[in-house]
Amino acid sequence: MAKRLWYASCITFAHRLISRSFPALTLYLVGLDAGDIIYIHAFGNSVIILNSAKAADDLLDKRGAIYSSRPIRTMIHDVMRWNWSFAGMPYGNSWRKHRGVFQKHFHIRATPRYEPIQIREAHALLRNLLRSPENYYHHLRRNSAALVMKISYGHDVAEEGDVFVTLAERAMSNVMKAGIFGTYLVDYIPMLKHVPHWFPGAGFKRQGREWMKDSRAMLDKPYEVVKEQMDSGTAGPSVMTIELENSNGSKDVDITTIKNIAAISYAAGADTTVSTMMVFFLGMMIHPEYQRKAQEEVDRVVGPDRLPDFSDRDQLPYVNNIVWECLRWNPIVPLGVPHATIQDDVYEGYWIPKGTTIIPNIWAMFRDETKYPDAFAFKPERFEDEKKNMELGNNDLPHIVFGFGRRVCPGRWLALDSLWITIASVLSVYTVSKPKDANGAVIEPEIEFTSAAVSRPKTFKCSVVPRSEAALALIKQTEDERELAK
């Protein structure tokens, strides 16, 4: 590890560095010269960027007792009032309480109960792609939102979408714009949150006030629907109904905690899996050879007469590799979710003060050529020979995409299951390819990614067509599920 810390004390320079078009890349390039640890100091705020998996493991995992808190992001926490999200709560009793309730429903032994819902929603996606393949992005958003709405609230989202899909998309879009630390000056100077919204230069307050409305609506509206259904006896099983029923007369869980738990699964699940599915569509479009290999595997294992289900998972290793490579190639949260130190520490001879914001540059970690040879390429086969990878110490499965230590994403098992069944289902009946213009010429995609806190490929056109008449018949057979769900 380099013994020199790269240091920026100028607020203007630091702000530009963090807010640049794709900050994870910028910080990766700085790290090539400066080393694995980059230190930025601005208006009394200490920020450390970790560009290597080793540094992240040493600090965020092995020293979790010190590095498991979260910094208060003033724009998000105080101005936009996203203080209900336990993902951003400081380490402490409130966070433990929220995480304990959440984990009860989403730990690795709990998620198999959601497999029927995941299969049903994967099939709904297949039908939607058949009706309007050009709207694939909308269908992916609806698919992700529908899954978490059913699990969290017992609400069935119509195949064309509904108000809750739109609400989640709008609210998450807002928080992603504000999600990169330093995008707003108030993150550096928290006292600015007290500036009146009408004051010159207080546009962030006016913007935050509008965004807060979407945040509150996402928190309150689904809850109100569930309460009405419970009162009328029409509510189906869900995280919300289970917790509300269990909370009657209990002092251990309050209504606010229940609302927060359901809303964070709704918020996170509705946005993160769609980002990885966009990477999948892009990867298959630009690498048809990988798509064909995966389709051949599905055909061999599943056959032509049915769609994949979870019993096929262990027999479809190449499909698994594609899921992992989608997560590695463009990690959902390139700069991770920031940690914060709760006491002073020393690492590799460097003093790290209490209250330092620690940003794990996951994108940079996945571009480490010593760990991921040909790291910038989309190559699912890098995960094929697990024994060889272990011997060479490279191509680790990218579990760190879900975070580190005590703050690792507790919904990761549901996310992995959802990605797998959706990707396997699409591969079984569709071919994703480059589109053609009116003259029949192939349209080459521009491979660009958004720079928000949750990153996805910038919207691109693609062709999504059934692989065969047999595949088309399988898609149409799922219409029976739609009728049963009504």
List the predicted regions and their residue ranges.
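Conserved cytochrome P450 K-helix E-x-x-R motif and the immediately C-terminal K′/meander segment
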Residues: 1-34, 217, 306-349, 369
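N-terminal membrane-proximal hinge/A-helix region immediately C-terminal to the signal-anchor transmembrane segment
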Residues: 1-80, 97, 119-124, 207, ...
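Classical protein tyrosine phosphatase
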Residues: 49-59, 68, 154-159, 163, ...
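Cytochrome P450 heme-binding "Cys pocket" and the immediately downstream C-terminal segment
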Residues: 68, 288-290, 412-459, 465, ...
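Cytochrome P450 heme-thiolate monooxygenase catalytic core
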Residues: 71-79, 112-278, 293
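Cytochrome P450 heme-thiolate "Cys pocket" and heme-binding signature region
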Residues: 263, 268, 385-419, 445-450
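Conserved cytochrome P450 K-helix/beta-meander segment immediately N-terminal to the heme-binding cysteine loop
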Residues: 346, 360-390
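Short, cationic low-complexity segments
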Residues: 477-486
